[in-house]
Amino acid sequence: MAKKITAYIKLQVKAAQANPSPPVGPALGQHGVNIMEFCKAFNARTQGIEPGLPTPVIITVYSDRSFTFETKSTPASVLLKKAAGLTSGSAHPNTVKVGTVTRAQLEDIAKAKNADLTAADMEAAVRTIAGSARSMGLNVEGV
């Protein structure tokens, strides 16, 4: 018989920088999960990602207090801000434009996010990322 699932925990943790401090410690501690074991496994799995980029993770906790986790790709908004050299998007995206991204940058982001997107092909993925860029107040060149 399969192990009984007791909780799903969704967090955003900086790649290769997980530690027992909030938000990781309290979220895992209340379910009885070994926090240091998770931190070591997460840091090992995210070695290939640029350190410090927020990485979404879904942790499945079982009744025997064991766990498994799945990492997702960095959010598109973070990658777009990095590509445009910004710290935040526009407070009024329809009227105040704060930066510009090119089609080549959108294609790079779409390739990085491709596993998590539901787009049928790369062109649809680029259009999805372009829509996210516009909603952040970025001008999109070449789309």
From Swiss-Prot:
Keywords: Methylation, Ribonucleoprotein, Ribosomal protein, RNA-binding, rRNA-binding. One or more lysine residues are methylated. One of its GO terms (biological process) is translation. Belongs to the universal ribosomal protein uL11 family. Part of the ribosomal stalk of the 50S ribosomal subunit. Interacts with L10 and the large rRNA to form the base of the stalk. L10 forms an elongated spine to which L12 dimers bind in a sequential fashion forming a multimeric L10(L12)X complex. Forms part of the ribosomal stalk which helps the ribosome interact with GTP-bound translation factors. This is Large ribosomal subunit protein uL11. The gene is rplK.
